[in-house]
Amino acid sequence: MSDYKSEFLRELSWRGFIKDTTHKAELDAYCAQGNPVAYVGYDATADSLHVGHLMTIMMLRILQRHGGKPVALMGGGTTRIGDPTDKEKTRPLLTDDQINANIAGIKTAFEPFIRFGAGPNDAIMVNNDDWLGKLGYVEMLRAVGMHFTINTMVKQDTVARRLAAEQPYSFLEFNYLLMQSYDFLELFRRHGCRMQLGGSDQWGNILGGVDLIHKTEGGEAFGLTAHLVTTSSGVKMGKTVGGAVWLNADRKSPYEYWQFWRNTEDADVGRFLRLFTDLKQDEIMRLEALQGTQINDAKKVLADETTKLLHGEIAASEAYTTATSALYSVGPVESLPTYEISKGEWDISPSTVALLK
């Protein structure tokens, strides 16, 4: 059992989210006092979020369930640079029109999971271009740059790995840490946000923001990271033979989404039930105890619950019916969904069976 006093942190803990935190005791006290404000940043590199983003979305959902206020930060400014974290080469830059179109598409992905509005714990969505776009270069250097050392920045995993491999690491990318840290400072000032959530790959960037707030405002801020999710076979969460598993319905149908979760590997079912559903702990433990072919029952529950969260109960029920018809119907199959698989995708598939699951 977790030793956290905060119900928010206790739930994150038993569900298996928490990897690292700053100032654990102080963070717990802040969350336990009620109405904590926390943010997650999302760069607008595509017009939809994908399953890989669900980890942090679910963290915001749990925060709101326990009375906290979620802040979804759109990276209209930082996307102009591109997050270099865990990237082996520089990303191509997007135009402002592309970034704005992507932000418009991303907004719809949040709505099934968190409630937006003007209430004390209603979520808000903000765009860091509102301050980064107005920040002059000299002002940025004076306000932020003076608080960071090159010595520290080159020790970050992504920077060190690129330099060791003699891969280019542009000055543009080098500024990403400063910009993300400044985001935290602005959210602290504008919205009283004292906590940043993210994947473990963002740990260095989060620490930068926590430190900047302490140095410039004398304020107390916190960071919490979650484990990066991979399947038991080592595949990055949300990636399939056909590409990313998108959250927007126009990019991935409810049936495809349901089928993705139904095809979860046996060893991952319990973990994914904890991370990606609202099921209570006792029910999850019951499903985790299933053995043999009964694991398929747990997989169906996982597929139903995750699809219900994103697309609604009716869409989840229809997806289940379609999948069942595909398995057991002896009638015509013209009405079933069809998908084209390129030769390249076929060639990289670990097996034909993986494509036919």
Question: Positions of the model-derived regions?
Answer:
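Short runs of predominantly hydrophobic/aromatic residues within well-ordered alpha helices
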Residues: Y137, F171-F184, I206, P254-Y257, ...
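Conserved nucleotide- and phosphate/pyrophosphate-binding catalytic cores
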Residues: I213-K357
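A generic alpha-helix structural signal
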Residues: L9, C31, I103, K107, ...
